Amino acid sequence: MSDKLNKGVVICATGSWYDVLTEGGAVCKCRIRGRMRLKGVRSTNPVVVGDEVLFTAEGDDFVIEELVPRRNYIIRRASNLSKESHIIASNIDRAMLVVTLSSPRTAPEFVDRFLITCEASIYEKRVYWKA
């Protein structure tokens, strides 16, 4: 790869490392450019699984330079009770939830939260009940 911008999709986010699936089918281990962390993002994680990104090769390293605008995302309040949010995933085409009726019993409120979260921006959603 050269210094030109390459496009890919984040398939794994672990700490400061991101696995990016390229348009050619290769997987590159990337880091994000430092200035991306400081762009006024009110999220605990600036890059999430599902994000389409533009990245460059710098020697043997790959660096995410920018995010392509997200079509949708699932978000929650950050666990540290700050005013920040935590984006769980982005650019979601469909969401499925498999729940059990017993052993262990799935709380109906959990299904409600799933459906409400998906209602805003995910067009295809399904719930499967396993008896």
Regions found by a protein language model. Give the residues of each.
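G-domain G4 guanine-recognition motif of GTPases
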Residues: 98-102, 126-131
